[in-house]
Amino acid sequence: MTYFSFRFLLCNSIICIFLGILLGLKRLLQNQLSARMQYNLSIIFLVVLIVPFFPIKSAPSSISWGHLLMPNSNTNGDIQTTFLSGNSYTLNKINDFAVSVSTQIPTFIHSLLVFFWSIGVFIMFVLLYHSAKQVKALHSSALPLQNEVINTLYIDCLNETNIKNTIPIYSTAFLKSPVLAGFLHPRIYFPIHLISDFNAGTINATDLRYMLLHELHHYKHKDILVGYLINTANVFYWFNPLIGYFLKRIRQERELACDSAVLQLLEETEYKSYGNTLINFAETIALTPFPLTMGISGNAKQLKGRILNIASFRKPTFTRDYEKKSVNNNLL
């Protein structure tokens, strides 16, 4: 435990350096990278946050595992051994540095650091557990959606997104905007007030279609799993403001990527209508109610960024070419 406290802080410093480089590159190339590509790069880096919790192997162990995993040959054997030895040497140097510095720091300092970190982890875990209980309570109070028109619209959206699995849709009085929840058993929860507004003619089927397409794309791209990873990282890195900013940014990139995925399904003439749906329901869909759910919501700054993304969105060239070929084939 004494060694872990310093190694964890050392890894945090190294991670922050690489994170700063990643954020700088993404800002530099923001006009060249699509919203989906930026989001995928963030997901890859999100996995890196697991590294501090893995033990560092010693050189002989790394080399022996390398020989087991990669068949040896006379020509490649020396190169393989040299490469693995070099990597193991570097890892061992980092390991030795962490151990040597940690031994110079009084034990009670290490214990104090671990104690305060553990308190923060416990508090964050309690908050996450409370959110999970809220989602469970939401499901207990929800009922299967009975509105036939919206159910038909939902089935059309499933077909439009090429989703073959059956995803149950429920109605609830405790939400202001639709959300997707559940990783093993995903469900969409639809607010009753939107159903009432639809029946009264206050909102139209197009608005509901956009909302449903948005939630279904969250499901299609496994955003629930990414959400769990983000919340887990939040628990263990609660003290690191740069990583906190990074995790908040991933959530925003997730919505931008989801918007872009929806826009790829729509005609260019519908982009403005999709943006208007976000603007018209900006107050209603102020925030996603629970950290463990996916929704179309966001704060004012995030909604502004999403509107700008919609305004500047252009379908990838291969998508436009595919649509032209489809039209030509239909004409023939």
Predicted regions: what they are:
Residues 25, 29, 33, 217, ...:
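Juxtamembrane interface helices immediately C-terminal to a transmembrane segment
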Residues 206-230, 255-259:
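Active-site recognition of the HExxH zinc-binding catalytic motif
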Residues 49, 54, 188, 229-244:
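Hydrophobic, aromatic-rich membrane-embedded alpha-helical segments
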Residues 2-5, 31, 94-130, 268, ...:
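Cytosolic-facing loops and C-terminal tails of multi-pass membrane proteins
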Residues 1-123, 140, 159-166, 303:
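Hydrophobic membrane-embedded segments
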Residues 55, 145-156, 160-164, 220-221, ...:
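Short helix/loop segments within enzyme catalytic domains
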Residues 32-34, 56, 97-202:
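Juxtamembrane/interface helices at transmembrane-helix boundaries
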